[in-house]
Curated annotation (Swiss-Prot):
<keyword id="KW-0503">Monooxygenase</keyword>
<dbReference type="GO" id="GO:0004497">
    <property type="term" value="F:monooxygenase activity"/>
</dbReference>
<dbReference type="GO" id="GO:0003995">
    <property type="term" value="F:acyl-CoA dehydrogenase activity"/>
</dbReference>
<dbReference type="Pfam" id="PF02771">
    <property type="entry name" value="Acyl-CoA_dh_N"/>
</dbReference>
<dbReference type="Pfam" id="PF08028">
    <property type="entry name" value="Acyl-CoA_dh_2"/>
</dbReference>
<dbReference type="InterPro" id="IPR046373">
    <property type="entry name" value="Acyl-CoA_Oxase/DH_mid-dom_sf"/>
</dbReference>
<dbReference type="GO" id="GO:0033539">
    <property type="term" value="P:fatty acid beta-oxidation using acyl-CoA dehydrogenase"/>
</dbReference>
<dbReference type="GO" id="GO:0005737">
    <property type="term" value="C:cytoplasm"/>
</dbReference>
<dbReference type="InterPro" id="IPR036250">
    <property type="entry name" value="AcylCo_DH-like_C"/>
</dbReference>
<dbReference type="GO" id="GO:0050660">
    <property type="term" value="F:flavin adenine dinucleotide binding"/>
</dbReference>
<comment type="function">
    <text>Involved in the degradation of the plant hormone indole-3-acetic acid (IAA). Catalyzes the first step of the pathway, the conversion of IAA to 2-hydroxy-IAA (2-OH-IAA). Can also convert indole to indoxyl, which spontaneously dimerizes in the presence of oxygen to form the blue pigment indigo.</text>
</comment>
<dbReference type="InterPro" id="IPR013786">
    <property type="entry name" value="AcylCoA_DH/ox_N"/>
</dbReference>
<keyword id="KW-0560">Oxidoreductase</keyword>
<dbReference type="InterPro" id="IPR013107">
    <property type="entry name" value="Acyl-CoA_DH_C"/>
</dbReference>
<dbReference type="InterPro" id="IPR037069">
    <property type="entry name" value="AcylCoA_DH/ox_N_sf"/>
</dbReference>
<protein>
    <recommendedName>
        <fullName>Indole-3-acetate monooxygenase</fullName>
        <ecNumber>1.14.13.235</ecNumber>
    </recommendedName>
</protein>
<dbReference type="InterPro" id="IPR050741">
    <property type="entry name" value="Acyl-CoA_dehydrogenase"/>
</dbReference>
Length: 389
């Protein structure tokens, strides 16, 4: 059901890395509750994500990166998410070059001077007032939902630059070493608990202007990746977490069904007509949603590689495919849990984890009902809300 990534892809980066073995380790540690109980992904796993290229995949080659396509990156996140949704979610922020590419080129050279494996975490909303000084901006405030912050090298926070109590220009993101921010461990959720999406607190940190940028501002870098719609990519890397988890749910049920009989003496689950029907239907819906998700990505990437700009309709299709896939994946995992019976209701049962994780994906603002409304606006030739495209 999954697109298999070859171990050979990582041989040039680190001969000791075996993606299959890493995923098995992640799965075992996640099922034992390690990441959920501590509310973050352990640092040794972050280091192994570096080794398989998660954080250099999208960095330009001139800075030591790999310049993968968006699809290649999403397929890797899908594979990791199949092992554990929280690890996949944290790894998805390897897409950070899409944001950081808006920094000045000289700043990027400084950022990657010791190598491209830089782990970024962000707390964007709400943008906090930041006083402009001759040296830069003074940043203070609290930001929520900073996924992966416990393992980050640098963090970015949303600011509204002020001078004489008046806002100056558009909101920006200020980037600083992670040790300049305090982490308050507030993340206690029903799903994706291991992402460690805690609060960032910053107290009067001076950030030079060259380390700030307008989020969503087009990058001045020439590589094709920086022509790809960054907000769409930010949505896709989260959606594909749900795709990976749903794939895991389907595979887990395929293994369970042939040997599981009812405690009341009924036939094995796999021999029940209703199970056969429901599983086939769920699998078809999943495969269709996943295929459309990747198809819309390929269409836009091919346009960019050919030197053309993607149309509003093509970009809107990517956003709509994300919302659709996220919801289908949540539906599929719930169906697998229902078919698995009473054993699937326990907290540490894999099916409970699958359901909780995919439902959290659907709660993200990028996958909200507004996406459907905006997609409808584009379909009718009308202007969508700012930030949709």
């Amino acid at each position: 059901m999954m697109n298999k990534l070859s171990k050979m892809e990582f041989a040039a980066q680190d001969k000791a890395v075996d993606l299959d073995a890493l995923c098995q380790e992640i799965r075992e540690r996640a099922c034992a509750g390690e990441f959920d109980n501590q509310a973050y992904v352990s640092q040794d796993i972050i280091e192994k994500l570096k080794k398989i290229g998660v954080y250099r995949a999208l960095v330009p080659k001139r800075f030591g990166g790999e310049e993968w396509s968006p699809r290649q990156f999403c397929e890797l996140i899908e594979t990791l998410s199949k092992a554990d949704g929280s690890v996949g979610w944290v790894a998805s922020f390897g897409m950070s070059p899409a944001y950081l590419g808006s920094l000045p080129e000289e700043t990027l050279k400084e950022l990657y001077q010791n190598g491209p494996d830089v782990v970024f975490a962000g707390g964007i909303f709400p943008p906090q007032p930041a006083e402009i000084t001759d040296e830069g901006v003074v940043v203070r405030g609290r930001w929520k939902f900073s996924s992966g912050c416990m393992g980050a090298d640098i963090v970015g926070v949303g600011i509204s630059p002020l001078k004489n109590n008046e806002m100056q220009g558009l909101p920006r993101m200020a980037v600083m070493p992670a040790n300049k921010a305090k982490i308050e461990m507030t993340w206690d959720t029903v799903g994706l608990k291991g992402t460690g999406s805690h609060d960032l607190v910053v107290e009067d940190v001076l950030v030079e202007k060259k380390w700030t940028f307008v989020r969503g501002e087009p990058s001045k870098l020439s590589e094709p990746f920086f022509k790809y719609p960054s907000l769409s990519l930010a949505t896709q890397v989260l959606t594909v977490v749900g795709i990976g988890v749903a794939a895991a749910a389907l595979e887990e049920f395929e293994k369970l069904a042939p040997g599981k009989a009812s405690i009341t003496g009924g036939s094995e689950i796999a021999n029940r007509p209703v199970t056969q029907y429901e599983f086939a239907q769920a699998d078809a819906e999943f495969q269709a949603a996943k295929s459309w998700f990747y198809q819309t990505m390929d269409i836009v990437w091919n346009e960019i590689i050919a030197g053309r700009e993607a149309t509003a309709e093509q970009i809107s299709d990517m956003r709509l495919a994300c919302t659709h896939a996220a919801r289908v994946c949540a539906k599929v995992t719930r169906k697998m849990q229902m078919l698995a019976g009473m054993t699937a209701i326990y907290t540490n049962n894999p099916f409970s984890r699958f359901v909780n994780d995919t439902n959290v994906v659907t709660q993200h603002a990028f996958m909200g009902d507004a996406t459907l409304q905006n997609a409808g606006l584009v379909s009718f030739g009308l202007k969508p809300a700012p930030g949709y495209l």
